[in-house]
Design a protein with these regions (language model features):
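Core sequence-specific DNA-binding domains of diverse transcription factors
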Residues: 1-182
């Protein structure tokens, strides 16, 4: 395809692309510049590989007496035969503990709001999200959501205590993935 960029549009710092198809292998996108009098560079001035990506946050369970690590991986789709792979070329996606929202169930759950707190270790593409141990008598569960969209939802627990302030967002919608397949 061909896209046209004129001088009035040249100040936009970021382009957003929506891939609505299933995960695909890397696609090379090239750029060829031609000015208004049609004198330009023959061929492409450069190309970049665009990949289908996602964040994978693993489930975990364990004792309320121990910290609970959850693997968090930045991945890209390589092929149908090789599936999702660690994206070692991603050195700039930043995930913070404040990007996670917590939801604590009521009935039958001994884990109250923010009796555990989230910390993040590691660096892209291999992070570890750790829930601090809530202590004896605080067995229970929490649903944890990593906010990747432009807007955040929920409350964070970055320190043990009462429910924390509103969660932030990593603002990386290109890493969202349809886990339910619907």
């Amino acid at each position: 395809g061909v896209a046209t960029l004129n001088g009035a549009d040249a100040n936009h710092p970021l382009a957003t692309y929506a891939f609505t198809t299933n995960p695909t292998a890397a696609s090379a996108i090239g750029i060829a510049a031609t000015d208004s009098d049609n004198s330009g560079v023959a061929g492409t001035a450069g190309a970049a590989n665009i990949r289908s990506g996602r964040v994978r946050l693993s489930n975990a369970y364990g004792s309320e007496l121990l910290d609970l690590p959850l693997d968090l991986r930045l991945q890209y789709w390589l092929s149908a035969a090789q599936g999702w792979q660690s994206n070692t070329l991603d050195t700039c996606t930043a995930i913070q503990a404040s990007d996670f929202a917590f939801a604590f169930a009521g009935a039958g759950n001994n884990l109250s709001a923010c009796e555990t707190a989230m910390t993040i270790g590691g660096a892209a593409p291999n992070y570890t999200a750790t829930l601090t141990r809530p202590g004896a008598g605080n067995a229970g569960w929490s649903d944890i959501t990593l906010n990747l969209g432009a807007a955040a939802a929920g409350n964070r627990c970055t320190a043990v205590g009462a429910a924390g302030p509103a969660a932030a967002t990593a603002n990386a919608p290109w890493l969202q993935f349809n886990w339910t397949g619907a």
